[in-house]
């Protein structure tokens, strides 16, 4: 596994964050379902995005890839020659690709397999399976990293648990408008990560699809709708912006370009979290609810570690089924740098009441990315609080979401050396 020595002090400079991966996935899919050509500008070819592009091509979309834009023609999507032809969709490690396209791939009768790697198929799919059983859609595991789907999605009533992943809802919201009859999605329990549904609904509206949202407890979908092509630019990704915002709040000086202050992205909440931490002056523990923002919990934990306060980030059990057990990985790796964190079943407790400036350590500490892009990037920012060098494994797992992160890190003054040990 690739290992490098990494060091950082105060990061300074200017960054233009990558486009929102969440929005880009959705624009690619919607464009691929539209009659006509759409132009999607501001593109980053991360591993996850490449997986979605190639998947939609397998379903018949014509996608022309340019340096910073895509031209997508969906007029041939779901043509007969793309159905029942033993097609195989490789999702790599992209949960969005898998869960968005699982129902979409069978809006017409189809037999198709999905494969992936890493922990992809350890992430739950039961929310789909329970509904597929109801409508007699067949599914079977070929092996631990591949599943065969055989059947046709039907209009009707679907029930989805609200506390597992909003991706199941998004997959159905893309698919059900294309069917002949009307449909309803009912949410069991409280919907978490509702901001991702807002992004989906906004995308669908842009492409001409109308959904009735009844307070996030049910969604009414009229059938026989048609996606309309269009030209759109993808805004900056607050999931990645969060790393630089936290870096600035703990001593770096980075100018961040191109932010949409009116963004629907839930991870924009990092701004509020930073403010809450900085302005908390009570003796009791500060409690932060991470249920709506799972992707920024590692970097939020770092911010909490530097605050000289006791902070607990709660409602984050879902982090255990990400690319890694992200809750455990966050605690384990930041603890190696001298921070005081406690892993709980559904939360992280951080006690940083001691005076904090920089952690001094002259030894070379070994840290693991856990092959998780967000852990790797959190470690990079954590080094601005650390007097010393670390060894990091598999640092290029960042390609999943931010392919040029380490180039940006170097441009801001970070250091990366070969590890010859």
Region locations from a protein language model:
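Short, structured segments at the rim of ligand-binding sites
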Residues: 1-421
């Amino acid at each position: 596994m690739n290992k490098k020595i990494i060091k950082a002090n105060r990061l300074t400079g200017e960054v233009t964050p990558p486009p929102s991966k969440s929005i880009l996935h959705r624009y690619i899919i919607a464009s691929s379902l539209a009659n006509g050509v759409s132009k999607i500008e501001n593109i980053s070819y991360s591993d996850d995005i490449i997986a979605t592009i190639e998947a939609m091509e397998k379903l018949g979309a014509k996608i022309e890839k340019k340096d910073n834009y895509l031209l997508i023609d969906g007029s041939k999507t779901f043509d007969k020659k793309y159905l029942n032809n033993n097609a195989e969709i490789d999702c790599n490690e992209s949960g969005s690709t898998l869960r968005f396209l699982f129902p979409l791939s069978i809006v017409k009768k189809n037999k198709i397999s999905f494969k992936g790697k890493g922990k992809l198929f350890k992430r739950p799919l039961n929310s789909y399976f329970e509904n597929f059983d109801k409508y007699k859609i067949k599914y079977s595991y070929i092996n631990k990293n591949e599943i065969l789907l055989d059947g046709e999605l039907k209009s009707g009533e679907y029930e989805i648990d609200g506390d597992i992943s909003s991706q199941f809802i998004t997959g159905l919201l893309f698919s059900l408008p294309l069917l002949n009859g009307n449909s309803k999605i009912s949410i069991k329990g409280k919907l978490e990560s509702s901001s991702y549904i807002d992004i989906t609904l906004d995308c669908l509206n842009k492409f001409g699809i109308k959904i009735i949202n009844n307070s996030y407890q049910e969604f009414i979908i009229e059938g026989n709708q048609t996606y309309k092509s269009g030209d759109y630019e993808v805004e900056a990704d607050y999931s990645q912006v969060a790393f630089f915002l936290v870096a600035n709040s703990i001593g770096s000086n980075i100018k961040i370009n191109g932010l949409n202050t009116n963004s629907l992205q839930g991870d924009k909440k990092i701004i509020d979290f930073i403010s809450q931490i900085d302005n908390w002056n009570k003796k009791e523990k500060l409690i932060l609810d991470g249920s709506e923002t799972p992707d920024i919990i590692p970097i939020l934990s770092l911010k909490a570690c530097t605050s000289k306060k006791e902070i607990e980030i709660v409602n984050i059990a879902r982090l255990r089924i990400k690319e890694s057990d992200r809750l455990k990985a966050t605690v384990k790796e930041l603890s190696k740098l001298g921070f005081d964190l406690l892993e709980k079943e559904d939360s992280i407790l951080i006690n940083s009441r001691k005076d904090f400036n920089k952690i001094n350590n002259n030894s070379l500490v070994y840290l693991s990315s856990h092959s998780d892009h967000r852990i790797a990037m959190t470690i990079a920012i954590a080094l601005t609080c650390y007097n010393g060098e670390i060894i990091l494994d598999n640092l290029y797992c960042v390609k999943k979401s931010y392919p040029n992160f380490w180039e940006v890190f170097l441009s801001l003054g970070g250091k990366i050396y070969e590890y010859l040990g």
